[in-house]
């Protein structure tokens, strides 16, 4: 399977230099199964399907979207199972839960260092590449062991600006 994601890449040294490119990740079902086992998670059919869906999605799905996408394929899948499984994956560090505001929670299977931009008009969430050493830009962080950082940006996407 191939995973195609659209990224808006920003070079933070030159704010005017912006490019859009498509990146392709090759992830096999066997690799995903091994990731679950490495995290100490038994790879049941439902867990593997949910993990595969979130890791393949570039749309930052909600639990409801994951459920709707997989319920026919898996038959006995419940929304509660999806919520519990996603929480299990988040707790294991396999995916991230995005809480850009108090009313919206979605999930991200892209574990590379990136920020999230949410358009205030259309609601679309876009991954923005960033340098891995962006933590060094934070003052007063010496002596801390940072295990996670999430950067959320809000504004208008290029499509909404054109309208």
PLM feature segments, named:
Residues 82-92:
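Basic amphipathic alpha-helical segments that dock to polyanions
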Residues 48-53, 65:
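Pre-recognition alpha-helix immediately N-terminal to the DNA-recognition helix
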Residues 43-45, 56-62:
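Short capping segments at the starts of secondary-structure elements
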Residues 27-40:
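Short, Lys/Arg-enriched N-terminal segment that forms or immediately precedes the first helix
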Residues 91-163:
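Non-DNA-binding regulatory cores of transcription-related proteins
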Residues 65-71, 82:
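A short acidic, leucine-rich amphipathic alpha-helix
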Residues 62, 78-79:
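Short coil turns linking two alpha-helices in DNA-binding domains
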């Amino acid at each position: 399977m191939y995973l195609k994601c659209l990224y808006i890449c920003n070079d933070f040294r030159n704010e005017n230099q912006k490019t859009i490119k498509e990146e392709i990740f090759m992830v096999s079902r066997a690799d995903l199964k091994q990731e679950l086992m490495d995290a100490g998670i038994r790879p049941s059919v439902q867990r593997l399907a949910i993990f595969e869906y979130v890791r393949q999605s570039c749309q930052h799905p909600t639990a409801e979207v994951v459920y709707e996408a997989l319920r026919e394929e898996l038959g006995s899948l419940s929304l509660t199972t999806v919520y519990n499984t996603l929480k299990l994956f988040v707790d294991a560090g396999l995916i991230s839960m995005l809480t850009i505001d108090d009313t919206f929670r979605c999930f991200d299977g892209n574990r590379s260092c990136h920020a999230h931009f949410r358009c205030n008009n259309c609601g679309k969430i876009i991954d923005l590449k960033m340098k891995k050493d962006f933590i060094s830009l934070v003052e007063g962080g010496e002596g801390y062991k940072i295990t996670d950082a999430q950067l959320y940006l809000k504004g208008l996407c290029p499509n909404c600006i054109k309208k």
